Amino acid sequence: MTISVAIAGATGYAGSEILRLLLSHPAYLSGDLRIGALTGHSNAGQRVSELMPHLPQLADRVIEDTTPEVLAGHDIVFLGLPHGHSADIGRQLGESVTVIDCAADFRLRSKEDWDAFYGGEYAGSWPYGIPEVPGNRDKLKGSNRVAVPGCFPTTITLGALPAVAKGLIEPDLSVIAITGVSGAGKKASVAQLGAETMGNLKAYKPGGTHRHTPEVLQNLQPFTQDSVSVSFTPVLAPLPRGILATITAPLKGDVDKHSVAQAFRDFYAEEPFCLVLPEDQQPETQNVVGTNMVHIQAHVDERTQRLVITAALDNLCKGTAGAAVQCMNLTLGWEETSGLPQAAVAP
């Protein structure tokens, strides 16, 4: 059986990254996966070669308008649409279609959190696409609906989770996360101009106002009886891709660097996309770009008795499109790592 796949919002950064990954997926190369409709409302009628010349295999394909009628009839539909647009289309696609949503519409389990951070109609929640969080993988297997997580929550969750779950820290987290400009999407804005971003660093959405904050809390709270709090400040950097998060929290009990290192290694021992680095190495964005990997390090600050965790990933790959393809593999019962790079391009 050949699986047909459509991508809504194919010309955006998330959509085009999904296409890049699918084009090297073993199922596509063997003919078991077919790339069907490619849609993009503002680019309808244009050829892929005009918009995404880095995808020559699809050069002659024409972008269609994003409508439920165009997307219906496919086995898998990836939604790479702005927040608020996915819920309406998702409702109109039948249960026979597996919908994998890269927006925020179905991530939050709490209506109160949705109202506080997004507003508008609350659409409910779908199985959440970080398979590495215990319990998530089983919910994703065979599911016909998937909510792909935000890029910051993936970085922070996978960085902090071993420490929270193993009781190494008081779960009062302070997070500063540096991100590349592609995280804001392709929509034109003065703040994203090269003249505004090159040679510049800028914090934004400070004071707990960033929309990804409740996702982090939602992910970590089930793994501790203590109340989790997160003070999160994102920082925009002149990078196309990549996130580097620094997470600190007070240590709990008798914890040293050896027990911390062992706890992190044990937690991710069976996870192919989570690499806990040797003590003398630090996560770097250049070492994860283009991959579905998360590189993680944890150090004990003995003077302040705090744990310092650093985590790096590619916001467009493991942070969005790679997670979407990883979840697709799980919903179809395929090998979870299929089509997902672990080796970066260096330098």
From Swiss-Prot:
Q: Which Pfam families match?
A: Semialdhyde_dh, Semialdhyde_dhC_1
Biological pathway? Amino-acid biosynthesis; L-arginine biosynthesis; N(2)-acetyl-L-ornithine from L-glutamate: step 3/4
Indicate the principal place this protein occupies in or around the cell: cytoplasm
Q: What class of enzyme is it?
A: oxidoreductase
* Compartments reported by the entry: Cytoplasm
Cite the active-site annotation. C151
Give the catalytic activity: N-acetyl-L-glutamate 5-semialdehyde + phosphate + NADP(+) = N-acetyl-L-glutamyl 5-phosphate + NADPH + H(+)
Alphabetic keyword roster: Amino-acid biosynthesis, Arginine biosynthesis, Cytoplasm, NADP, Oxidoreductase
Gene Ontology cellular component list: cytoplasm
A single Gene Ontology MF term assigned here is: NAD binding
* Biological process according to GO: L-arginine biosynthetic process
Please give the SMART domains that the UniProt record associates with this protein: Semialdhyde_dh
The record's Gene3D superfamilies line, in alphabetical order, gives: Dihydrodipicolinate Reductase, domain 2, NAD(P)-binding Rossmann-like Domain
Q: Which domain of life is it from?
A: Bacteria
Question: Which family does the entry's similarity section mention?
Answer: Belongs to the NAGSA dehydrogenase family. Type 1 subfamily.
The record, for HAMAP family, names: ArgC_type1
Known function: Catalyzes the NADPH-dependent reduction of N-acetyl-5-glutamyl phosphate to yield N-acetyl-L-glutamate 5-semialdehyde.
Its recorded name reads N-acetyl-gamma-glutamyl-phosphate reductase
Name the gene that codes for it. Answer: argC
